[in-house]
Amino acid sequence: YRGVPTMTAIAKHLAIDMTVMRGTKADSISQQGNRWMAMLDNGETVVAKKMLITSPVPQTMDLLATGNIVLPADKLARLSRIQYEPCIAVMAVLDGPTAIEAPGAISLEKGPISWLSDNLQKGVSKIPAVTIHGSAEFSAHQFERDHMEAGQRLIDIATPFLGTAKVTEYQVHGWRYSKPTVVDDASCMLVSEATDLPPLALAGDAFAGPRFEGAVQSGWAAAKRLMSTH
């Protein structure tokens, strides 16, 4: 699956008629009778009949713990088996075009870099820029260290792919739960099933597959499950 012109275009289209609270974190959630209540970091509260959580499973478990929400043992065991690998990503602006051939992306199986993309070629940037993903091994080794230094190392290693272009500025981001390496067999999980909890479903790429397609299909499956509950 691919969003046009960018991956976020799909979410933006779906959210046209929705109230989306961007830049807002749910600090805690709790059961209030047959409702869910979420306490937000801006001091507001949200009350809902049903809830869907799509964050990485370790973060989801931490959020559920804030409200002392106890999950069935079988579902808890399945969730505990899910594992992720980290990724250190670099977004770099260049002073000229790269040497990356069309269509503008390279996947590498060995070495500290797993992925490079020419964002100008891909049409997601109006100026020369690249995205560099560190490999799982490199990212795990560097994750608790200085990310800017790790980013510079990736840039240095990527130099042959940049041609004569030089990096003028760059940013580094670390995803602790970048890609699931052990996933659940189900497309989603209705954790409230056979409990006194209000309807609560978990979804994401840790269920239907560790790719964007898996996350989308998991979301569809969870929506169907929640819509069928009362």
Task: Provide a role label for each language-model segment.
Residues 1-13, 21, 144-153:
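Short beta-strand to alpha-helix junction loop
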Residues 22-37:
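A conserved short coil-to-beta-strand element within the FAD-binding core of flavoproteins
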Residues 152-153, 157-198:
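Flavin (FAD/FMN) cofactor-binding core of flavoprotein oxidoreductases
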Residues 91-142, 148-149, 153-162:
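Active-site substrate-recognition segment that forms the wall
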Residues 80, 224-230:
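Active-site-proximal substrate-binding core of FAD-dependent oxidoreductases
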Residues 130-131, 188-223:
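Short FAD-binding loop at a beta-strand-to-alpha-helix junction that anchors the flavin cofactor
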Residues 45-103, 164-165:
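Central helical "cap/lid" subdomain
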